[in-house]
Amino acid sequence: MSTVKKSSKKKSSKKSSSGNESSKKSSPKIVPKHTAKNLPKPIKNFEIDLDKCANCPGCLTYLSFIRQVENIIQQNSSRSTTTQLIVKLISNFVWKYRFTYEQIAVNLFKYKFKERGYLVKILVSLGFDPNNLKINGHKVLKILVYENDIPSIIALVENGANIDFGKAPSNILHICASRNYPVLLKYALSRNEIDINAVNIDGRSPLYLACLYLNKECIKILLDNGADVEVCTPDEKTCCLELIIFLGNIMHNNLEVYTEIYQRYGDKYSDNISELVGNIVDALKYIISAKNNMSRQEIYTIRNLCFNKPIVMNEKIVFDLFVFIMDKFPKIVYNKFTHLGHNAINTSIMFCNNSLIKYFVDKTDLDFQAINNNITNPIQMLVNHGYIDYVETILNRNPKIVSTKCRYNNNLLHYTLMPCYVYSNVPRIKSDKDIIELVKIFANNKKINQNHRNNSGYRPIEVAIRYCSIDVIKELLKYNTTIFAENRIKQQLFPVLNNNDIISFATQLGRFDVVTYLIQENVQFQLYQIDDIHTVPTALLIAIVYHRKNFIQFFLELPQITDCLNNDVTKEYVINFANMYSNYNVQITDTYNLNFIGNDKMSFTHRIDRMIHFYSVHYGYSKMVILSGLSTILSLLEKICLASKKCKNYRNLPNSKFLEATIFSNGPCDLTFRNEFSNLYTDINLLNYMNDSKFFDNIVEIIGDLIEYPILLDIFEYMFAVRDLPISSQPIIKFIESLGLINQSNKIIKINKIVNELLNKSEISIDLNDQDTHNYDDYVENDPEFDSDEFDTDEFSDEAIKDFFGLDNKNLLTDKTSSPIKPIKNNQKENFNKKIDKYRVENMLHKFCRGEKLPHYDIIYKCLMQTDYYQILDNKIVVHNNEIILAVIYKLKSSDSTNSQMSHKPSVKTNPSDWIKSYSTNICSPNKQDHYHMFPFVLDWILYKWSCVEFQTKDKIYPTEFNTHLYFYGELNTNGRMVKGCFEYFLNCHKSLYHRLFHEIDRVPPQIQRKIYNH
């Protein structure tokens, strides 16, 4: 007995100590987990310490209470009697041992007492509130939910406990969905007390959590009870999108996904990824079955999932998934699967997914033309990728599809010959055999015009020369007997746009095999017109410009060439042409033949300067624009080389993302030239030039001449081909490496340095935004397109205008015999001329030099370079020639609040909104060289800061753009007398001056007179 007492004291001491520690905390610590054989095993989430209460008097007392309750229930068959006895027992227990109803209830659930529901009901009748049942601040009901103790949960809920946890981070639905408690989930939903779409603290719905943890039975239960599949998380993910992304990461073997798998599922799928994939697909099918439609983001993600070749899973799995989606949403095939508008059929072809391609072709109800005209449609892509069998199947089904509209004005024969760029890890090679078979299909079709030109000026034959083997070219020429019958454009050396000199074209591209074949077939040379009498084969000039020495030697041996060069004028022209535009020194041999000697020691600077000079003279591009274009492309090539080098050594670093996102995703023009180089040469609208295929080709040709031309051509063709299509980084890296561009990096850096030095030396800072290719000669002079009903037709007398402006003709030296004006201080002619840059004048007159220089070029050039004297006063500008006054321009008072505001009615401006950037070729033409057209050109340099009457009219050639009409009021010396009127400057929408004329005041439109009078 003493031993027992001693042990009891010791135990009591421990209990007392434990009680003191507990009293310091905010809430009493519930008796934790124990292993005493005489006590039942408690629930683990009640945090019970097994060792502390093996012989705890409280636990033993409670055990005694439980046994008494069990005895009462067993000994009494009457429920009412049993209830009365238990109530009496509880009352004695509470009074004797100071237990609360809550403590009794906690222990009921802690030890899973069999009749806990019955006892809870009795406790509630005694005043117990089940909603206040907590352990360490946590509701017992929530703990029971985590334990999936359904009987205990029912005992509490059926006796008044609220099944909703209130504002807790997760409710019972979230817990059941994430822990896969389908039975409890059904019970909770049957209560209809909780919103099935309620989100937890992380913004996730029960359905989203069930999908996240792949609890398929819970997914089905939630969907059957009306769960919304479109509920989004804070980062705008639906459960469908989450499953697609997760499956895509597994499919592409994303290394980060394995960490995510372990965090979600532990070791469950560590050795069985196929089971995981199967569960994801099953869950995804449940969700898709419940959807009414799919969002654009979900469609884009499905594209990457279903069309890319899987790495770690069977292709049939994603194929079956897409077929399932198609059965649910048949029209999804025509939805945009890329931001550019490619549909599902296009995407399957781009990714060479043969299973899906066959599936689409076999579906007879699909329309292979149903796509917007801005992108290539499916039939064009099938042709371009060389799927002969599928093409024949579709053509047999719908023969009219052969005349379908094509992007960039290509026909199906163009697509047959164009290169095929693939975007998957399994490239599709379009062989010569495939191309020839397709040529046979389309070349015999009467609905396809073999001489049709696309937007780049290419016929199918030019496309073949650029991309295909000689065998394909021979096959194509068999079916086209009219290929050489077109009218040829003379005075054009660059033969790409709208020209059919295919010998020159092949020479430019370095296709010696094509040139020799064409000569054997007696194809005629195009002749470049030197003057009215003498000509020279264009191909020879092209060979000189692009340094094709083997071509030059071949041409010089041909009778057609030697006959031309027998003429001294032609021979001298060729010699001068070579010395001016190439790195060849040309000598005349003893036999009076030409000997081309390559100057390998010529510096890059000299070669670049010659090439720039050639393109400036023949195509009207300014030196500044050409240098800017060269710098932009060379800088891009530097970046490609740098990124490629890093990718080669560090495949998983973000350098491949540069190649994917920066260069190829949105195309070289839209992204590279706009974003990467947006800070370059802001005074020049370089992007407009880079979007001009002719200018871009010219720039590529210049750089190609300085480095290896085929490499450069291939890379830019690749860039332009893939700009509209999704592409992964690895094919890009492999393609760049195969080109050998990295080996040219030092040369590229050197050339770019030279170009930038030339650019820095240039003092030109003029905005060359003029993309105008029209001369505007058809514009009618004095045709402002006014509505005459809006204005009065009053004419104003000289006296009225004189009184308003306070003018006195006597003070203007209008008398013919008046004394000459003395030289004006601070206005020396020499100083002004120094400000006029001849390059700027040449740029403004570049239209006069397209092809053959126009005869009146020298006249207008001289007028702009040799200006008269002028003096700017407060209220007027006086132009003179040191002897007499030539013109006077008066200042008008502007009442406009802004000068930038576009107005379709006449208004007085402080200075013009726009000014001259170039001259149309009708200016100073032979019928416009009278005194009224040729008033002092010095005004063209100074009136851009002077007040005028201005208004805008719609451009006749570009209806969405506007022309600017400017009227400067003043006087012009005409036959020795000063005549009042307006100096008229009309600019088209590209700021090209197409009308320059002085009108006497009575011939000025009345509405303009009215504005002058009112101001």
From Swiss-Prot:
Biased-composition ranges, Basic residues, are 1-14
Q: Which keywords annotate this record?
A: ANK repeat, Repeat
- What SUPFAM superfamilies does the record point to? Ankyrin repeat (SSF48403)
Protein's UniProt keywords contain Repeat: yes
Annotated region Disordered: the residues are: 1-37
InterPro entries in the cross-refs: Ankyrin_rpt, Ankyrin_rpt-contain_sf
Q: Does the keyword Repeat apply?
A: yes
Report the domain of life of the source organism.
Viruses
Query: According to the record, where are the ANK repeats?
Result: 136-165, 168-201, 202-231, 340-370, 374-403, 456-485, 498-527, 535-564
Q: What is this protein called?
A: Putative ankyrin repeat protein R96
The source organism is Acanthamoeba polyphaga mimivirus
